[in-house]
Every structure is written in structure tokens, then in C-alpha cells.
Amino acid sequence: MDQMQLNSKPLKLSTIVGYGAGNFGYGFVTQMITSYLVFYATAVLLLPGSLIGLVVSLSIVWDAISDPVMGYISDNTHSKFGKRHLYILSGTFLIALTNIMLWHVKIDIAVWIKFIWIFSSVFLIKTFVTVFITPYAALGAELSTDYNERSKIQAVKTIFFLTALIIVTAVCMFVFFRPTPEYELGQLNPQAYKNIAYTSSLVMLLTGLWTYFSTKSYKTEAVVYQDKLALSEFVGQIRYSLKCNDFRQIFIGYLFTNLASAIIGVVGLHTFTYTFYMNNYKIGIVLGTQFLVCIFAQPIWVKIARKIDKKAAVKLGLMISIVGCMMLFVLVLLRRQVMVHYEYMIVYAIVIGFGTSGLFSLPLSMVADTVDQQELETGERSEGIYYGMLNFGYKMSQSIAILILGFVLDMIQFNPNINIQNDFTSMALGAVLSIGSLLSFVLANKVYSSYNLNEEKVEAIQRQIQLKRVSK
């Protein structure tokens, strides 16, 4: 059946929720690696930090490069499962299996064996995550041709992802890392990581299968099927995607917004700890508030995008985020007062949480609109390439931020061996977080200004596509 005709009816809520559920399992497993792998490998397995840093850095690069490759493979797959569901199903099981493998390293074996185990496990799980997530993301663009329903699909998907992040970073600390007679610090207990691995793999299986069965009636075939995958064709499709002005603006804008997110991830904890001298309870309150606002604001941003269109909604979100960064900089200047009244940081968390909420989901919806533009111009649909490239930019921005900020920490004389940093370092940490994020949001706002698609243009494109298909 014609893909455009197939997806013209409004989706059932059960389908949208079922699709979004897959992002919960993905978020659960990947956030476990982000939050706990370095500590597990260094503090529990006693591996050198330099080796683990090498593994993490190389895996991020591999993860980024493999995304567009997987997108190309998926775009050109011809299978009874469709071009996405074969990988969603196989990726679900392979992630669950390799995730358990990653967290089941014997402590008493040689260091080089532990390193090889961690190295191979990380690269395997990163590979299978790509096998799952790139076709999964592309499927989200194929479920509906409705301009506003696409925003709803991405909002629900984002809610699942952010919920997984909160559970892994906060709830798991209380549930799995309880002190025992043998391990007063629960996070040093090897069995705790095995238990989380069993739990996260089960979650991945349940949510991955939920997504598969909820969306299996939306199987699609390649609009133009390549009998043989070719490097020249792959490179050509990447070049075409980046030549497309509207996709290029999303790609670069999304890269900048995620650069701000990476800055928060790298130096956020440093700032909360050494600039504002907040304990784990206060940090948890602030970050928890930010995540919760981000989750509950998703439906609001869907309504805002419906009312003022997606581009205007994204720019509004960026402006609110810029205001949040300005607030943070003022709080850094008044850090001595904030040390006494950390509640000021909650106000910042609400503003930045609301502002960034739409930046998680709306650009993903906009990518689907640019693929319609591609089909009109070329007769091909390459959702896999487009979402793979978006993931590539996102992950490379993370890698760049980690690399640069590592040097920045040295430049501002951060000393990890002391609990109280000097005034210059305390101030500089807050400045890096607030000003660095602000500049990223400002650059993203400038880039998105050149995006041209809106609801009227996308609907006109879809009508022209339909006429071309009918005339064939």
C-alpha cells in the first residue's frame, strides 16, 4: 500500500504510546552506561581511569559514525518485517543480551581481561543500540503525515526518554545501592550493578516488544529500493541531506542545543558542588525539578507549536532557555546568597526546564517534514539517513564538549583533591556553565532563523507528492 495513503488516518493513542515506549527502554539502558560505567569500571573493577576514558571516547565516535550507516542500511532494506521493524526487533534482544554481559565482569580476573571484556561489551552494546535506535527514530517520521501529529508523536517519545533518565539517575540510587554489611557504600557492591543490568534488560525487552507489536501494521518498504548497497550512494545521500537548507538548519541548530546539554552534563555537577556548595539532596531537588518540568511541559509545547508553528515554538524555547542562562549567571554572581538559599536555583530549574522541553522533541518532528521535501524533489525517502545524521551531530557535539571542557577545567585551575575551590575557580565554573550554554542557545537561535518550512508549505508538498503518485 502507498506509504502516504497508509499513514493518512489519525493514529490511535495506543499506537503513539506504544511507539514512545521503545524510547524508555533505550533511555534506561544508555543512561545506565552514562551514569555508572566509569564509576563501575574504576571503583569496582579497579581499572585505570585512562583506559576507561579511552573506551568511552572511542565508543562515542563509533556510535556517531555508525548512525548514518545504519540509517542507510535500514532505508534500503527489503524484508517481510518492513525496513524498520526487523532492526527494532533484533536490536531489542541484542541490547538486552549485551547489556547483561557488560555488567557481569568478574572482579578477580586479570586487568587486561577485564579491559578487553569492558571494551568489547561497550562496543557491542553501542552497535546494537544503533541497530535499534536509528530505524526506530526513522519509524517515528513514517507513522503519520499530519504536520501536528508528528509533534505529538515526538513529545510522547521524549516523555518516555526523560522519565527513564530520572529513574536511572535518581530512583536506582535508592533502590539498588543500599548499604549492606559487606558494602557500607552500596555503589561499591558488584551485585548491585548485576541487578540493575537484569532490570534494565527486562525493561528493554518489554518496551522494545511493545513498540514492535504496537506499530507492526505500519511496516513500510523502501520508496526506492537499492539492489546493492553502495558507498557512493551512501555518501551521496549524506551530501544531499546536508545540501537541503531546512534539514541543514535543524542539523546545526540541534547540534548547538545539544552542545549546551553536554556542557551541563560535563560541568553541571562541578558548578552545583563547588560554586554553590550544594549537597546531593539539594542537587537532586534542583535537577529533579528541571526534569519534571521538562516532562510535563511536553504537551504544552505541542499546543504552542500547533498555534504558532514549529519554527516559532523552537525559537521561543531557545529564548526562554537564554533567559534561564542569564538567570544562572546572576546566581553565580550572587553565589554566597545562593549557598544559604538554594531555593533560588529551583526558579532557574523551572525556567530552563520549560525552555529546553520543546527543544528535545520539536526538531525531531521537523526532520520528518524535510523528508517530505526530499521525496518531492527526488522520489526517495531517506528517514534513516536523516535521523542517523541528526544523531551523528548530537553525539559528535557531546564528544567535542567533553574534550574541550576537560582542558577548560585545567585552565581554570580546578583541583579535584580539595573540597573548597579558590574564588576564581568557583566563579569560572559557573561562568563556563551559564555563558557556554547561553552562547550555544544564541547560535542555535540564529541557525533556526533560516529554516523555511511551515504547516502550509508541508501540506502543499504532501499534496504534490500525492498527485505524483496517483499519476504513476
Language-model features, listed with the residues they occupy:
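Membrane-embedded alpha-helical bundles of multi-pass transporters/translocases
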Residues: 2-472
